[in-house]
């Protein structure tokens, strides 16, 4: 809140690893705040594990072969929803979520695979 008190705290469980440090923008996450909601964008496999106490775990991804883009939205009380924005079958390139840029009420991600590049704009 505006007094600096912690109202809620949540973990986002995501297993990830990277062999090449240049690939790290593809496997991390981006967080932004809009309309009193916190949004987290992540690349992960499509297999999501439901844990106890309303928790979920996203498995890591090999961004070359499996890069699904998810968004998690969390309200002021810590309640969250998640959904897949793009599957690896729908996008031609993996998106660098850790390098997202917030512009007004949107976030823009750059996708890249070899020489192929693509921009993705998501309205919050």
Placement of each model-derived feature along the sequence:
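Short, conserved, GDST-rich strand-edge loop motifs in beta-rich repeat architectures
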Residues: 1, 43-65
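Hydrophobic beta-strand positions in blades of beta-propellers and related beta-sheet-rich domains
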Residues: 2, 68-71, 117-121
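Conserved blade-ending motifs and adjacent loop-strand segments that build the rim/top face
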Residues: 5-30, 65-70, 74-104
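Flexible loop/turn segments at secondary-structure boundaries
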Residues: 6, 16-18, 47-50, 116-117
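Extended hydrophobic-aromatic, low-complexity segments
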Residues: 6-10, 39-42, 49-53, 81-83
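Entry beta-strands of beta-propeller and related beta-repeat scaffolds
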Residues: 36-41, 104-109
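Beta-strand C-termini and the immediately following turn/loop, strongest in propeller blades
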Residues: 44-46, 110-114
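Extended, compositionally biased alpha-helical segments that mediate assembly or anchoring
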Residues: 110-111, 121-124
């Amino acid at each position: 809140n505006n007094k600096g008190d912690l109202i809620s705290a949540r973990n986002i469980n995501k297993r990830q690893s990277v062999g090449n440090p240049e690939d790290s923008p593809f496997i991390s996450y981006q967080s932004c705040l809009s309309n009193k909601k916190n949004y987290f964008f992540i690349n992960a496999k499509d297999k999501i594990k439901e844990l106890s106490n309303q928790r979920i775990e996203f498995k890591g991804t090999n961004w070359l072969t499996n890069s699904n883009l998810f968004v998690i939205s969390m309200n002021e009380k810590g309640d969250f929803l998640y959904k897949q924005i793009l599957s690896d079958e729908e996008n031609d390139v993996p998106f660098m979520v850790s390098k997202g840029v917030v512009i007004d009420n949107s976030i823009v991600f750059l996708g890249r695979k070899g020489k192929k590049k693509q921009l993705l704009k998501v309205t919050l």
